[in-house]
Amino acid sequence: INYIHPDFRGVNNTKNACCSELVIADIDAAIDYAIVHGNVDTSKIYVTGRSGGGYATLASFMKAKHKIKKFAAWVPLADLAKWYDQTKARKLKYSAEILLCTSSLNGELNKEVAIEKSPMYWKTPAEKFDYSMLDIYVGIYDGLESNSPIPITQSINFYNKLLQDMAADSSAYITDSVKLKLLEYEKPLGDYGKIADRDICFVKKYKNLGITFFTGGHEMLQQFAFDELMK
């Protein structure tokens, strides 16, 4: 097994960070390096990350050049523009960092750049689902405390966006009713089993795309995440 953990462009508070084209190129370059210098089975390349790493995982799925077997995004960010409003309303430090990474001036968000850096607004490469899997994992309590800063609606809206771009049947979507129940009840909506030692609150799957909500916060269940990638 070859494990690479590139730093990309550092903390997400500069114009070159926050899933810029340079970050996407860094991900591709890191994989290229591993292929050249490691004993790599190119049919078994995986990308995973938590939080900002989950954001990068979604960006990699949308734009990276390699044929990846599986992407797993844990508690990811998908919409930088909307997250600015969410973090500003909650007076979290991230709102100031978003201004920095979007070249914003005078405390006003440069929305054009924020959208450019948001997978939510990118074209979906639907053909990738012919050979790649994308799983999104969401802690049901995320977005409720300062140390759990990304609302679950970020993942829900991105999941539904992919379905829309794939012209999926309406039954595949997470409905507004389910979204409201997840936000209100913060507990399993049925018997969906467990991941690791956590109850699954809700799960949805369409072809090679899946989303799982579990009892937890802004976290990755590391052993489960590794084992699931290796399947």
Describe each model-derived feature in a short phrase.
Residues 1-13:
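Conserved alpha/beta-hydrolase
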Residues 9-11, 79, 219:
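Active-site loop signature of alpha/beta-hydrolase-fold enzymes
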Residues 15-18, 59-60, 82-86, 146-152, ...:
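Short, solvent-exposed loop/turn and secondary-structure capping segments
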Residues 18-38:
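Alpha/beta-hydrolase active-site loop
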Residues 33-92:
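Primarily recognizes the serine-hydrolase "nucleophile elbow" in alpha/beta-hydrolase
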Residues 69-70, 76-77, 81-128, 181-193:
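Mobile cap/lid helix-loop segments that gate and shape the active-site cleft of serine hydrolases
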Residues 117, 127-134, 205-209:
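Short, proline-enriched alpha-helix->beta-strand connector loops that line the catalytic pocket
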Residues 137, 143-146, 153-231:
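C-terminal catalytic histidine-bearing segment of alpha/beta-hydrolase fold enzymes
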